[in-house]
Amino acid sequence: MSERAPVVTIDGPSGAGKGTISQLLAKHLGWQLLDSGAIYRVLALAAIHHDVELENEESITLLASHLDVKFLTGNEKDPVQVILEGEDVTTAIRTQECSNAASKVAAFPRVREALLRRQRAFRTAPGLIADGRDMGTVVFPTASAKLYLTASAQERAQRRYNQLQDKGFDVNIERLLAEIIERDDRDMNRPVAPLVPAENALVIDTSDKGIDEVLELALNYINQKLSSTN
């Protein structure tokens, strides 16, 4: 890890636009990309591929320490492309089996510690865009610039509804809204690493803003922060 490599953290709730803005920033700046929300799913899939028992904390921790994963800028359908051991697993990590397995491996404290170190190892030159929920508060507390994207629960539910409809899923928007509100409450009130803006983060409400406007706000802020540290 290079402590000198700049890192920009982008935190916020699901559906606020973190994934889209993160990959656009990474592409624009030519920086590395970290999608921390996918990392437990990637680890779970690696365990399944290597026939590692999900209940074996020692084996899962070892796997986490050497996890061969890359995040690449993708396209409009999948903003972030996830590569595990050279294989595109962007779709594979979204299965229910993988989701259930991710919940199991995430319960181990040693696994969480190993993945924390693994995430910090993404901080390499020329820089890193880190997308998540506790990037600016826990993983990279000394980040060069910190952003927190948010939007109303109704707007985020509508975005998720449109996204799933485009992929051919039959979904209920009221159920999506209820799930988002429930997850917000859980994430914001959990005792460890609650979902809150970092103390010195720029908060951007994306509810009534287009992608280009949010990107411009983010870039202006990042450039300002980077120029003040040089």
From Swiss-Prot:
It is found in: Cytoplasm. GO terms for molecular function: (d)CMP kinase activity; ATP binding; CMP kinase activity; dCMP kinase activity. Pfam families: Cytidylate_kin (PF02224). GO terms for biological process: nucleobase-containing small molecule interconversion; pyrimidine nucleotide metabolic process. Signal peptide: none annotated. ATP binds at residues 12-20. The keyword Zinc does not apply. It comes from Shewanella oneidensis (strain ATCC 700550 / JCM 31522 / CIP 106686 / LMG 19005 / NCIMB 14063 / MR-1). Belongs to the cytidylate kinase family. Type 1 subfamily. Its EC number is 2.7.4.25. It comes from the Bacteria. It catalyses: CMP + ATP = CDP + ADP; dCMP + ATP = dCDP + ADP. InterPro entries: Cytidylate_kin, Cytidylate_kinase_dom, P-loop_NTPase. This is Cytidylate kinase. SUPFAM superfamilies: P-loop containing nucleoside triphosphate hydrolases (SSF52540). Keywords: ATP-binding, Cytoplasm, Kinase, Nucleotide-binding, Transferase. One of its GO terms (cellular component) is cytosol.
